[in-house]
From Swiss-Prot:
This is Phenylalanine--tRNA ligase alpha subunit. It comes from Chlorobium limicola (strain DSM 245 / NBRC 103803 / 6330). Belongs to the class-II aminoacyl-tRNA synthetase family. Phe-tRNA synthetase alpha subunit type 1 subfamily. HAMAP family: Phe_tRNA_synth_alpha1. The keyword Phosphoprotein does not apply.
Length: 341
């Protein structure tokens, strides 16, 4: 056993390691778990008990010498590889790292909030899963109104004792909750997601973002409403923006109007986006209906108010001249990178 150890020690000393290939051959022959050194350690149990300490010490020395030779060779070859590697040119430009940015919908929504906040409006929010009572009943919707049909509204459950549960079709329920919980005067905006059972196209989507506003005080008039909308539009779209008010109907306002702006794509000449009209609707508005105020515990003989609501996504299309609303929901990185932080 001792002679085999000395012979292997001489063999290891004479082994020339001139390349990585030689180094790998050395490792496989001597230092791996099934190499020659490990075989000798396995034979240690056949040695007489009184000789085992001395033989074991010789084996440990053998293994140490082999490991040191292997480590020294690895260090040499590693240093040689480092010297051969191309030098780092510190004058080269760094690699570009793409940073995240605010989604255009959130950017526009933030700007809208800031504009109305400067006018004295506070922000109110509410649940997206809403009761029929808040979404329709308290907003003066008659029982047979088309909006209550399955074709227009996503109902979650129907026939519950507490009322039908649905995905809200507008953020008006938030206004109802504010009126029920707070005495006038009230001045709030209500941003959030809303859901409607609509066909998806370049102009409409089944989920979109909406911002509604409510102002209730004494002697509030339609002139106050127009002044608020004109001020908002000039700050949002520029001081030269053209607006058009059209008479309309909403169950929760009387009188009611819709507000249009000049089409952003054709400049009012007529195109497929504006359906050849030259105008695009941006919001609906009107004076809060007396029935709504009574149902919410506010006396319409003492108080008056206006309400308005607009699609945030459509405002994004107007500001950035995007011709397809679906682009806002696809999370296409090529489109989103056009709106850097």
């Amino acid at each position: 056993m001792e002679e085999a150890i000395r012979s292997l020690q001489q063999e290891i000393s004479d082994f020339g390691i001139q390349s990585n290939k030689d180094l790998e051959a050395f490792r496989l022959k001597y230092t791996v778990r099934k190499g020659l050194i490990a075989d000798l350690f396995g034979q240690l149990k056949t040695v007489a008990p009184d000789e085992r300490p001395r033989i074991g010490q010789l084996l440990n020395t053998l293994k140490k010498n082999a490991d040191e030779k292997q480590t020294a060779a690895e260090a040499v070859f590693s240093a040689q590889a480092a010297r051969k590697a191309p030098a780092l040119d510190l004058t080269l430009p760094g690699r570009r790292h793409y940073t995240g940015s605010e989604h255009p919908v959130q950017k526009v929504l933030g700007d809208m909030k800031q504009i109305f906040h400067a006018m004295g409006f506070s922000i109110a929010t509410g649940p997206e899963l809403e009761l029929d009572r808040y979404n329709f009943d308290l907003l003066n919707f008659p029982p047979d109104h088309p909006a209550r049909d399955m074709q227009d509204t996503f109902f979650i459950t129907r026939g519950n004792p507490s009322g039908d549960v649905l995905l809200r079709t507008h953020t008006s329920p938030v206004q109802v909750r504010v009126m029920l919980d707070n005495p006038p005067p009230i001045r709030v905006i209500c941003p959030g997601k809303v859901y409607r059972n609509e066909a998806i196209s370049s102009r409409s989507y089944c989920v979109f973002h909406q911002l509604e506003g409510l102002y209730i005080d004494k002697n509030v008039s339609f002139a106050d409403l127009k002044a608020t909308i004109f001020s908002f539009a000039r700050q949002m779209f520029g001081k030269d923006v053209k607006l058009r008010f059209r008479p309309s109907f909403f169950p929760f306002t009387e009188p009611s109007a819709e507000v249009d702006v000049t089409c952003y794509l054709c400049g009012g000449k007529g195109c497929r986006v504006c359906k050849k009209s030259g105008w695009l609707e941006i919001m609906g508005c009107g004076m809060v209906h007396p029935n709504v105020m009574r149902d919410c515990g506010i006396d319409p003989e003492v108080w008056s108010g206006y309400a308005f609501g607009m699609g945030v996504d459509r405002t994004v299309l107007l500001r950035y001249k995007i011709d397809d609303i679906r682009l806002l929901f696809e999370n296409d990185i090529r489109m989103l990178r056009q709106f850097p932080a």
